[in-house]
């Protein structure tokens, strides 16, 4: 549903959805139960600061999203949506076609950029510091993209999951 998609369209990775309270309320809950969080690192919201900064050519955000050129072969891509794969946006660097696995309000991050990986690790470490013990890796199978492939369950994605597990251990 649209509401569920919005739930997974992260605007700020370090904040609790205000409709659910804040970190103080979370800590009260966490004192009574072991908690699990969705780690949504495949994509983030087109309303996020990262995306706004990407469009303006500023950091953090510049280079964070997957720009798809004409030479990228998407013919074998497998995804659970029938909406257009690419979203055209105007940026300070001109018109860009960005990868959107699920919807145009959820823009895929570019894990070929080491800064994006560092951000994902920083987010995970922050959530661990909040005593979250378990994580569901939302849409993780779609994390890495390689021209001419289905862009799902690629080796690079599995390597990244191994890295996340090492951090958790």
PLM feature spans:
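Acidic/aromatic-lined carbohydrate-recognition and catalytic surfaces
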Residues: 1-121, 125, 129, 140-169
């Amino acid at each position: 549903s649209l509401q569920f998609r919005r739930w997974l369209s992260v605007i700020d990775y370090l904040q609790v959805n205000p409709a659910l309270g804040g970190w103080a309320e979370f800590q009260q809950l966490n004192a009574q139960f072991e908690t699990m969080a969705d780690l949504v690192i495949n994509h983030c919201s087109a309303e996020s600061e990262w995306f706004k900064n990407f469009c303006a050519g500023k950091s953090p955000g510049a280079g964070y999203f997957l720009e798809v050129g004409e030479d990228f072969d998407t013919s074998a891509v497998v995804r659970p949506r029938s909406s257009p794969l690419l979203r055209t946006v105007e940026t300070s660097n001109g018109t860009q076609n960005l990868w959107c696995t699920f919807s145009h309000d959820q823009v895929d991050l570019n894990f070929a950029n080491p800064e994006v990986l560092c951000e994902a690790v920083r987010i995970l470490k922050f959530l661990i510091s909040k005593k979250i013990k378990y994580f569901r890796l939302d849409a993780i199978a779609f994390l890495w993209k390689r021209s001419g492939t289905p862009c799902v369950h690629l080796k690079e994605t599995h390597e990244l999951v191994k890295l996340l597990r090492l951090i958790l251990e």
